[in-house]
Amino acid sequence: QGPSPRHPIPP
């Protein structure tokens, strides 16, 4: 798998 951020992307 790839890198998964633990926080959502800011708008």
Curated annotation (Swiss-Prot):
Keywords for the protein's UniProt record, in alphabetical order: Hypotensive agent, Metalloenzyme inhibitor, Metalloprotease inhibitor, Protease inhibitor, Pyrrolidone carboxylic acid, Secreted, Toxin
Family statement drawn from the similarity comment of this UniProt entry: Belongs to the bradykinin-potentiating peptide family.
Modified residues (Pyrrolidone carboxylic acid): Q1
Molecular-function GO term, any one: peptidase inhibitor activity
Tissue: Expressed by the venom gland.
Name this protein carries in UniProt: Bradykinin-potentiating peptide 11a
UniProt function note: This peptide both inhibits the activity of the angiotensin-converting enzyme (ACE) and enhances the action of bradykinin by inhibiting the peptidases that inactivate it. It acts as an indirect hypotensive agent.
Main location: secreted
Compartments, record wording: Secreted
Segments crossing the lipid bilayer: none
Protein's GO biological process: regulation of blood pressure
Entry keyword Transcription: no
Keyword Lipid metabolism on entry: no
GO cellular component: extracellular region
